[in-house]
Amino acid sequence: DLHKEYRRQRQMCIRDSPTAIFTFGTAPGTAVTGKPQTVITTNLERRANMEKVGIDYLVEYPFTEETRHMEPEAFVKDILAGRMHAREIVVGPDCSFGYKGAGSAELLSAMARDLGYHLHVIEKEKDHRRDISSTYIREELEKGNVEKANQLLGQPYAIHGEVVHGNHIGGSLLGFPTANILPPPIKRLPRYGVYVSRVLVDGVYYKGVTNIGKKPTVGGEYPAGVETYIFGLEGDIYGKNIEVQLLAFDRPEQKFTSFEELKERIEKDKEFANAYYENHPEMIAQG
């Protein structure tokens, strides 16, 4: 997950050479336990982030049984120095790699001279004495505290996805056409509820109100989804890939007694979003 620490690591890269981020295509925890491990940033989202911050290459190395059992020395020699021809390696102080995570920054340092690379170990960035980490960010997302999570990430928490057909209740019954995306099961979603959002469609940012959850008022069994009312957007966007960035928590998801009551609540949600943007005009202006 690309939080502030990794952004600082990127800044250490030498710009007269191509830059690359090395990661695994599948989270190691998923491969080891056989159970899907949720992630703050999916592979699709990571690729978009890398492009935004100017990384030349993103290596999503397959985490196979062979990779899992590779000795750390072989990982450094054969993959980092051998296949990737690394000349500058940037890591955190607690990095681990190789079989049973036995590889460390100390090992990288010990092998640097023989393999011809320079090692940069970047100390962890802290927030009020606590290390900024994926665990910390997940805790804030579970509380619905996206503003804090965004501060830790160094950018808005975002959900990417293709706009799919929903139940059309937003447009037909409520008069609020919405864009529905279904995130993959591995995507770590925040606390269910309504958020002020910023939505990227065809390179243009729009104000939005986003519901994360299972639509309890509608009834039936629905997977957790992301449904967004986009201010000022006209036209059909079904099938398009959009990015929904969450900016502020409005309220928890709740079940209403009627669609009329839901409609009234959505009007208040829109007012809440407009008030947020009046106080934070830069969130649209900066794009």
Model-derived segments and their meaning:
Residues Q11, S17-G82:
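Core alpha/beta nucleotide-donor-binding catalytic domains of modification enzymes
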Residues P62, P93, I212-K214:
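Short secondary-structure boundary segments
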Residues G166-G287:
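Phosphate/ribose-recognition catalytic cores of enzymes acting on nucleotide-derived substrates
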Residues H69-F176, L200, T257-E261, E267, ...:
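Classical nucleotidyltransferase
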